[in-house]
A protein has these predicted regions:
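Amphipathic alpha-helical interface segments
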Residues: 273-295
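HKD-type phospholipase D/PLD-like phosphodiesterase module
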Residues: 1-21, 27-175, 186, 191, ...
Length: 295
């Protein structure tokens, strides 16, 4: 089931944790939500094994903030691993564990939201809650691989939209027949994505936050010269943090931004959605489009 933030709040994540019988495996770019941490603490108290993977060097966060995240997990009795080295930033290396998901063995939440107050109260985000056995197994396989520092293998790449290596699936969503609507925090610098959007022309509509970078503004100007419709959503009262693409046949929701690093180097996770989720995404997009301003 698809959930929209900030309407849903932390409830979809809490559901996964509260319904865990044996284990909770959580991987998120950053974790500071008190309701989520409290739910994890209660899970530990019920005898549930709680494992958490966090990015040790998230962009823009201070060391004390990262230490606070780690201390919170360890204080409740959870087991903490930092992301594998290949998904951690270093001098001259712009790469992150940017995934955002939680699984309990029979159910997973996968989406665009970090687990913090802002995501659940001030951001546009999308979360998908699924009991699809193939998706659950694939996500847990990725978690176990990252927990042990191994490769995830081919099966998760077939079932999920998984980075590194998610560009082909995202391009296929953009290239589907008919119009496409996109919400994203960044326009990004991936040439193939930009060219695919340009090829859509007026059949593509894009909503970005009004705070996009100068480089994003140049890319937006280029896309508009090819006919792409772009609007900017003011940062307040609601910030556009989502990463969503929807057409009439298929949709994407996940952690991936449209940058080469996000698609080809980071750890990212998303899903391809069909059926009723598409209508829900299109309805929310149309409401956001009406609120956004012309560039």
């Amino acid at each position: 089931m698809l959930y929209v933030e900030p309407q849903a709040g932390p409830a979809p994540i809490l559901q996964v944790i509260q319904q865990a019988h044996r284990s909770v495996d959580l991987n998120v770019y950053y974790l500071s939500s008190r309701p989520v941490i409290h739910a994890l603490a209660h899970a530990v108290g019920r005898g549930v094994r709680v494992r958490v993977i966090l990015d040790e060097h998230p962009y823009g966060m201070k060391p004390w903030q990262i230490r606070k995240e780690a201390d919170a997990v360890q204080a409740i009795g959870g087991r903490l691993h930092w992301a594998p080295t290949r998904f951690e930033a270093a001098p001259g290396r712009y790469v992150f564990d940017h995934a955002k998901y939680v699984c309990n063995g029979h159910e997973c939440e996968i989406g665009t939201a970090n687990f913090d107050w802002t995501a659940f109260h001030r951001n546009r985000e999308y979360l998908d809650l699924t009991r699809n056995p193939g998706v659950v197994h694939a996500a847990m396989q990725v978690f176990q691989a990252d927990w042990t520092g191994q490769g995830a293998g081919s099966t998760p790449h077939r079932i999920l939209v998984l980075s590194p290596g998610s560009d082909a699936k995202i391009l296929a969503v953009i290239d589907q027949h008919g119009p496409v609507d996109i919400e994203s925090e960044e326009m990004g610098n991936d040439r193939a994505i930009l060219d695919a959007l340009a090829a859509k022309g007026r059949s593509a509509r894009v909503i970005l936050p009004a705070s996009i970078s100068a480089q994003d503004r140049r890319n937006v100007a280029w896309l508009k010269s090819r006919g792409v419709q772009v609007r900017l959503l003011p940062k307040h009262p609601l910030y556009m943090h989502a990463k969503m693409i929807t057409g009439k046949d298929e949709a994407f929701v996940g952690s991936e931004n449209f940058s080469e690093a996000s698609l080809d180097r980071n750890r990212e996770m998303g899903l391809l959605l069909h059926g009723g989720a598409i209508g829900k995404l299109q309805e929310q997009f149309n409401r956001d489009w009406a609120r956004a301003g012309e560039t």
